[in-house]
């Protein structure tokens, strides 16, 4: 891998809203971004590249996948884009905004759910710990691990039921019952959990 390859990776990451320093080095945040990309890219194998080795090294296959992803508008899967999951806490890059944490199981579950519920609109995906604290999120929020999304129920054709969410592979389900803010929280935490917002 050359400095030019690493610079390409950094520009690509920034096109997704990550905010890496463009220095052509394989530093901590560049490696972390590469690992996340390698782990999540090709869910549903929509481009034919296949699974990538998750090693944080942008080899030829990873670079090819990044170029395809860029040409496809930054898609992480057939129906979802990386930008939909990014931290919305700040437009100014900070240490906490240099990453998009995103678990493969989360995106796979969203693809399965979309098959039965139709188009899905993500209100919130990954949150940096700093942003999560600022909005009053719980300290162990699954959003900070890239395992959770909040969906706009009002923008969907049909209401997602708990049964549909569980069948799609979501273990954490939180349903908003206030009429002024209709969202559903879904996550892929290790232990099944359900709650209602009041």
Predicted segments, located by residue:
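Second-shell loop/turn segments in exported
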Residues: 1, 19-24, 51-53, 92-103, ...
């Amino acid at each position: 891998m050359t400095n030019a390859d690493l610079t390409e990776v950094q520009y690509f990451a920034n096109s997704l809203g990550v905010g890496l320093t463009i220095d052509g080095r394989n530093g901590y945040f560049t490696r972390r971004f590469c690992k996340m990309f390698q782990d999540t890219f090709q869910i549903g194998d929509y481009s034919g590249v296949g699974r990538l080795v998750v090693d944080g090294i942008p080899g030829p296959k990873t670079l090819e996948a990044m170029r395809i992803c860029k040409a496809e508008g930054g898609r992480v899967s057939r129906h979802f884009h990386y930008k939909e999951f990014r931290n919305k806490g700040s437009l100014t890059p900070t240490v906490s905004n240099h990453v998009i944490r995103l678990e493969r199981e989360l995106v796979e579950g969203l693809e399965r759910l979309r098959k039965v519920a139709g188009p899905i609109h993500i209100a919130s995906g990954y949150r940096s710990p700093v942003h999560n604290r600022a909005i009053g999120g719980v300290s162990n929020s699954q959003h900070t691990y890239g395992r959770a999304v909040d969906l706009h129920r009002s923008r969907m054709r049909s209401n997602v039921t708990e049964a549909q969410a569980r069948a799609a592979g979501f273990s954490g389900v939180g349903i908003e019952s206030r009429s002024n803010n209709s969202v559903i929280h879904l996550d892929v935490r290790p232990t099944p959990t359900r709650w209602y917002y009041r």
